[in-house]
């Protein structure tokens, strides 16, 4: 209903402008036009509402209701508004409730039924701006030689969902995995490798990732406790950075082993992502320092090179520096992130030519990225009209409100968590089959359990406000009741059941007979028509939970519709009308679940 909303807003703005000019108050227009027309706070009030008359009362020095009467009179003279609106009613002290005409809603619903995208518009590229339509989403980003743990879950699925939404809108999306594949830790890892496999480094290819994690712990223990090992590790870092062939070989083997584990998890979660680790930006680090120096924003402080940040201070109230080169000449995460942001906004072939970059990390990195973005803007590496966003998220907690860990106090491996979700989903399914005295094949049970289990984990995360911490509970997320993936999947299965029972064939010619009268039909229509507005809002504020909340409300609305009106037993025209609503609900659900990275089922 976005097109209708935009047209309605445009016409209300024109009427507001006419009113202001008539009263010699034209200068107030820009301030008053903000949120001039909004979604109605309650369904019974109408489709939209306008509260501007309360503000106009202060300007015109009149009672708001008196102004509302004058404004509604002006609006009713607008032919475009008359074509769209059934009524403009004044309520309370001066609110204007807007109700759209039935035929306007029916035409819109017909259009969405026929649209494979359920009414979601494609972006229109602004050729005059010179900007590309490329969006980079930087997410997941595990570290080499470490297993992915539950902390990587949020970044991975939030980043994937945001990517899918931008792709649906028609953006060219580059999904980047900024893996931690470089740094001083590789000095100790390679030294340990050479100590253990001095005769044949290829032996590392036979090590499993779980062994590699223990290997990392053993390396760290030696580094912390053995001065001679520590010395050799630091020397190994220099060798690696200078391109020593043996060191590079060992580094590649470590990366390859980790990559196998990462890829297994990404395949299981249906995540598409391009690996481009920290090492990719190594050749650009020196030029980052040189460029900052050339632009006279680099300062040397106590031997380190840094840029002092505006509006950011330490506990003593002194300006905070973003250090980009350490006292010993080494670079850090900030240097790498600055090199990355510069490369990503640079025009091809020297960069990615992005118009927007979205970083999905935990909120603990908020200050880091605020500093990096500020320095990048000072250096003019973020072009005018381009956008950079940090998408922070909270912790995954246990039901006790503490950070989710194993009974032994260890961080939970992501692979184990996902396997447990599928196991529990299978357990629930087998119990349900037994209760229903129903037989299904092993293939059906395995596939259904996988889709429900993984879908439940994803949805439980995405349905939360990403900024807050959330408590992880298998019992809640696998429930068929409430705002859960199983509830949404069940609703979709219910619609599939209606279609399987239907022996009536209808086509596009039957569209002329579509008509709606029942209250539950109109509620479902209005809910379906809000889909495009939800997607556009996520494009702006990057909050996927908006889509989850919408889907839960849509399923509730559909299930009330299903319970209150017959579908297959009605006469032809009513049956066609209601089956079309079922089709559009199913299409909207499938498309939305796909945007959340959740597979769907025909039967459960």
Swiss-Prot record:
Pfam families, A to Z: Arg_tRNA_synt_N (PF03485), DALR_1 (PF05746), tRNA-synt_1d (PF00750)
GO MF annotation: an example: arginine-tRNA ligase activity
Gene Ontology terms describing biological process: arginyl-tRNA aminoacylation
Chief place where the protein resides: cytoplasm
Reaction(s) this enzyme catalyzes, per UniProt: tRNA(Arg) + L-arginine + ATP = L-arginyl-tRNA(Arg) + AMP + diphosphate
SUPFAM superfamilies documented for this protein: Anticodon-binding domain of a subclass of class I aminoacyl-tRNA synthetases, Arginyl-tRNA synthetase (ArgRS), N-terminal 'additional' domain, Nucleotidylyl transferase
InterPro entries, alphabetized: aa-tRNA-synth_I_CS (IPR001412), Arg-tRNA-ligase (IPR001278), Arg-tRNA-synth_N (IPR005148), Arg-tRNA-synth_N_sf (IPR036695), ArgRS_core (IPR035684), DALR_anticod-bd (IPR008909), Rossmann-like_a/b/a_fold (IPR014729), tRNAsynth_Ia_anticodon-bd (IPR009080)
Residue positions of motif 'HIGH' region: 142-152
Cellular compartment(s): Cytoplasm
GO cellular component term of the entry, any: cytoplasm
CDD domains noted in UniProt: Anticodon_Ia_Arg (cd07956), ArgRS_core (cd00671)
Keywords: Aminoacyl-tRNA synthetase, ATP-binding, Cytoplasm, Ligase, Nucleotide-binding, Protein biosynthesis
EC number(s) per entry: 6.1.1.19
Alphabetical list of HAMAP family matching this protein: Arg_tRNA_synth (MF_00123)
Summary of subunit composition and partner proteins: Monomer.
UniProt cross-references to NCBIfam families, sorted A to Z: argS
Protein family according to the UniProt entry: Belongs to the class-I aminoacyl-tRNA synthetase family.
Name this protein carries in UniProt: Arginine--tRNA ligase
